[in-house]
């Protein structure tokens, strides 16, 4: 593994699926597009630290086999392999973020740093670090490897968050922060990742919460006319939960 001060850390970023393989699908939304967007953002954050060289398994919407993904990482002698995915389940209530890794010390340690940063940045349900030897890209790469499941495309609230460009920034920034923390690299991204977004107008609010907030404004439960709000993401979630509760049945 690269040593700090000797050379740059070489990180292979693997956006899951692509091309003829869309991955998990919910309506018009496909996993392959989310993974590529987040992967590119992750590369931007890591490269901004001047400590990392990035190797991609794909940078566009093309199909890359699992074997080729591993070969790219192995032939480039990468120090770590980070695979980005979006989860799916038959139960639409399933939600949250998890990080998977092979039974290997460095992989487990990196996974813990990444998972901690992701939950801290997003407030998502913590599904934890999971050990598995069933994923080809984890057991066929010759370096420590982790796979991030950054939310459930099958869960409406997770999906609405994943659609939001700022939320994708938080996911990518948190993964970058976890990697930097693992390598004990001080990073400017920590401020970016933890800085909460404030929604000032109805138009800025993600679709999953827009109707609930509008109703609250119309009834006077929220002061303002929809053009002078100051709502955090946590507030949006509470508003949606409250709206569903009072309107259930």
Language model region names:
Residues 13, 184, 246-248:
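Short, flexible coil/linker elements and helix-boundary hinge sites characteristic
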Residues 16:
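Extracellular repeat turn/loop positions enriched in glycine and acidic/polar residues, especially those
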Residues 26:
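Active-site rim/loop-helix segments in enzyme catalytic domains that contact anionic ligands
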Residues 192-249:
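Short, solvent-exposed alpha-helical surface patches in non-cytosolic proteins
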Residues 3-11, 20, 29, 33-193:
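Active-site-proximal helix/loop segments of hydrolytic enzymes
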